[in-house]
């Protein structure tokens, strides 16, 4: 990139062209005169169309202008050339010139050269120290930033707000949360605790380590607030799943007239995604559109993920289509969305489209398409992409192997899945054996299931999931003694099954239910509603699958137990409290059991609604008596 200078300095534009052909700059102490640069007189006698033969003597302002241009446009080579000429001038020991050079090298990322300038400066002031500290902080050298800050204090220099904000950022990056209170106290001592720049840095440090009360105290103490301080606090609460507080602060920020950044939007979309606050996320998205913000990749990718995780795959696709620019994260987000929703053929099509437009798939891309193939029964396609990944030079990681085992296992090729595990170049992880165990549950292979379970217990004895799966395998085969042995082992080792719960969001409120829930104020209406639905689905052929009841009781009691699983209660509640014909969204913290899957599938037909259920494995779109998974899950 060429330097662009004011008209008065057009003649000096020839410097870059002329000097690029000269030797590389050398130290001012070099004894080799042949490597020295020509004199200032020769260099500054340049020609241009309008300043033929004119002479402009170099002064501090001239050199500063050159260096600032080099800094702005990150022209490190030209900056070195200017530096070499300063060394031949009367400004070689000038403190202002030294600070400008130091800043140029630091901003261009050449920190070693910046440090050499610093060390050779005969005089330094607080600007000198601050510039070097800021350079280290901005270029991921937090240890050096903290080291030079300590030296600065030892030499008796007083920091300003920019010094302190850089040091606080360095402490945050260095994961020295313990330094936060010490630095905060130092800022109070120096009188900078209410400064907006220092306060914003402290906010970021405290929120990174979850010290939200301390962050709020800093925020409240600020004499004035800017968009950085607002965004830092919003992002902090969003990261810590304080979605409601983050949304409350977002509204306060708007009332105070500040403009949200793309970082704020991304934080809020991410928080709404992780906590299931779809309606609030839609409101933030609507405000973003109203304010005229472009949907750039950073916030757009998070918004796409929010819609996908909330069950709105079509909205996720719309966001992808509207992105001003798509990066590999954008494509991966779309692929992951299709994988989670079980749309394997669509994921395969978009993966090929990604390659066609020149975006090189990475390890996440391949993981997503493998997952999509696994969830859709696309065995041949999945194996093709596993081989393609290796051809593309991407070394499979543990999660890729998990997905391939899942792919083979779901397809019923359990022996091939076992051989694949035994021949892997890595030691099988608990997750890999668990994938085989799940496949054994699906295909009722008791012996191989027990073999896989033993490996999981050895590698991850505290995970209750594999114990429950093995119990269900034994129970479904009528092997109650073996099932009882599993329960006894769980009790003796202190492993407890995670309580199942389901929840729905209605009118910006989350309603959570557990099995046999007796606490809800509408419990009687909920029970009547489910009995009504149950009678209708039985007319369509529903028969309770009592193999999913993990307690050994008589058949009648097992059937009663089945009808009060948390997802069925959540469905009945949603039917009572949402408009007829509207889509119902239910989320569950563990895998949906087979009986509930069948019941909800038939319920979608008798109530005439689309019901979207998200569990830990995937999304199920129930509509007109069918499920998007095609019962392959």
Curated annotation (Swiss-Prot):
What's a single GO MF annotation on this record? zinc ion binding
Q: Any idea which UniProt keywords this protein has?
A: Mitochondrion, Repeat, Transit peptide
Segments carrying the region annotation (Type E motif) are 432-507
Q: Which GO terms describe its biological process?
A: RNA modification
SUPFAM superfamilies found in the cross-reference section = TPR-like (SSF48452)
Q: Per its UniProt record, what InterPro entries does this chain match?
A: DYW_dom, E_motif, Pentatricopeptide_rpt, PPR_At4g14850-like_plant, TPR-like_helical_dom_sf
Q: What is this protein called?
A: Pentatricopeptide repeat-containing protein At3g24000, mitochondrial
